[in-house]
Every structure is written in C-alpha cells, then in structure tokens.
Amino acid sequence: MRLVFLGAPGAGKGTQAKRLVEKYGIPQISTGDLLRAAVAAGTPLGKEAKAYMDRGELVPDKVVLGMVKERLSQNDCKKGFILDGFPRNVAQAEALDKMLSEMNMPLDLALNLDVPFDDLMKRLTGRRTCKSCGQMYNVYYSPSKVEGKCDKCGGELFQRDDDKEETIRKRLEVYRAQTEPLIDYYSKKGILKSVSGTGSIDEIFNSICAILEKK
C-alpha cells in the first residue's frame, strides 16, 4: 500500500498517519524530517540542501526527490509507505510519479483529508499554549477551565505568532491554491479518495481504513 496523504495545515494528517503506521506497519515519510535528518547527518544531498537553506532559498525539487528516493529504497518501504508533505504541487507530483514508475513502486492511492475552511481557521487560530508547561488548549474545542490560565499549572496561556488569524489565513490560501490542481491531478489518474476530516479521531480513522481495505 503506497499512498500520498493530502490535507491542509490543521486537518489532522499527522494524527491519522501515526495511527496508520501503527495499524499497517508501513513507514510515514515526511519530507521535512528527511531534510532535517540529511542536513544533520551531512549526507551529499544534505550538504546540497543546506547550501540552499543557508542562502534562504527553497530546496529544489530534484534534491528533495533524491532524498525521497533514498528513503524509499530502504527495506521497511517494501510493503508500502505514507508520503506526507510531498508532493505540494502538480510539477512535484509528475516528477514523483516518474521516479516511482522507474522504481516499480507506483502509488496506489492519494488520500485527501477534507476539512472546511472555517473549521481549519478555528482549529489553528484557537490554539493556546501554556508559557510554563507547554500544555495545549483550543478556545473553541478544548478550552481551559479559567480563561487564559492553564488547568495543570496555573500558567499564562498565549497564542503563538504563527497561529494569528492573518498568518493562518495566508497559509491556508497558499495551500488551497497549490493543492486544488493536485487534487484534480490525482482524480484524473483515478487514485484520489477524499475523507471528511470532521468528526472524532476514531470516526475519521475508521473511514480511512474502510477505503484502504477496499484497495
């Protein structure tokens, strides 16, 4: 089972991917993690990526694809994998398909975790963190008992700058602009499945498993 996991920031991809790893025993491959690990290990691709990052530039697709190829060549990917955070646009999807075809590992499924825009805004802008112990809350879904105070330690709750409304709105708009063509791309290939990302974690997970077990 080889799949790409699509979903906006705040859709809950990380939570669901973790549960899929536990249930099916296939690795979750995050390009962000791959980049950090390659840079830390000082691999040839890591050094190349670091040179771009040090200049404040985006790491080119060919470097990221090289890292993905190295990771997919490892034994734990033989039964399948979950690609998370890549591809982000159609050009990357086409390059990934070409590479996977050459490796004889074509994708089985592109899974889109679909959450309405307003829900994503609440999930992300509603986040609050305790300054003292790091405990997380959400003013809409899981508020603290006393507004602005941590239930665990009484510390002050704050909103991170990157959770402010304007920042989140921009992030979601960029995601939507990039990803709508990607959803169309996988739909035309006949491998796209969408799952509603609203409901309990268990309900969403059961919907995903029902799709995977039909494959």
Curated annotation (Swiss-Prot):
Catalytic function, reaction form: AMP + ATP = 2 ADP
Enzyme Commission number: 2.7.4.3
Annotated positions binding ATP: 10-15, 127, 199
Annotated segments matching region LID: 126-163
Pathway(s): Purine metabolism; AMP biosynthesis via salvage pathway; AMP from ADP: step 1/1
Entry's localization field: Cytoplasm
Listed GO CC annotations: cytoplasm; cytosol
Keyword Transport attributed: no
Stretches the record annotates as NMP: 30-59
Role of this protein: Catalyzes the reversible transfer of the terminal phosphate group between ATP and AMP. Plays an important role in cellular energy homeostasis and in adenine nucleotide metabolism.
UniProt comment concerning the protein's domains: Consists of three domains, a large central CORE domain and two small peripheral domains, NMPbind and LID, which undergo movements during catalysis. The LID domain closes over the site of phosphoryl transfer upon ATP binding. Assembling and dissambling the active center during each catalytic cycle provides an effective means to prevent ATP hydrolysis. Some bacteria have evolved a zinc-coordinating structure that stabilizes the LID domain.
PANTHER family named in the record: NUCLEOTIDE KINASE
Protein known as: Adenylate kinase
Species per Swiss-Prot/TrEMBL record: Thermodesulfovibrio yellowstonii (strain ATCC 51303 / DSM 11347 / YP87)
